[in-house]
Amino acid sequence: MKGLHWEGTLNSRNHETGLDVPPGRVLAVVGPNGAGKSTLLDLLCGLLKPDRGRLDIDGQVLVDSRRFVPAHRRRIGLLGQQPLLFPHLDVLGNVAYGPRAQKLRRDKAKALALEMLERVDAAGLASRRPGELSGGQAARVALARALATKPRAMLIDEPFAAVDVEYTPRLRVAVKAALAEVGCPCVIVTHDPADVAALADDIAVLESGRIVEHGPVAEVIAYPESSFGTLLFDRDQPEQSP
């Protein structure tokens, strides 16, 4: 079966949590502090090993009771709160690093890196060093680097935390377009309802390690059933992107 599928526990309370994200869909995970959002991302990308759980992507089992595929072999792209770029490499070298690690020839890796930079409207930054980038520019480069590895799934954690507020809408547009082109399943953790409306197709509300509400963006925003969903969306929200 195509897509990302997870079922397991996030904490010692042994609440079962299940996610099913088809290819090309973006699932926003929201919830109060301590709900387990970061733990969920760490489990999916391989930074944590679950006490009990199963993860498969495109039919390949990555985690179950008998196996645990390490993070570097999962081909899952991760875009975190703070873009982590190698300071000794220029932007093109940073984006080409992943493909080179996957044994792609140097010339092909650079061509792919430039293609990914163009996709996020950052080709003009290719020769710059990370220290010369603004928060928004660094976020674009980090997104290009994640996409250059041809990920089977994308995980995004508060991607605009280090971005100036006035630049955030433009970056949301770039992220949305890039994810649509790649077409892989994506899980985004955010506290900002504007991120949900602009980027996501579906929402999962996480509380105390379990999903208490799940559904299409428009439905959950209009008729939230959980206490946190009601609190988060009980205000005028921007329209969801078509």
List each language-model region with its residue ranges:
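A short, proline-enriched helix->beta-strand linker immediately N-terminal to the Walker B motif
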Residues: 148-152
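Conserved ABC ATPase signature
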Residues: 129-133, 137
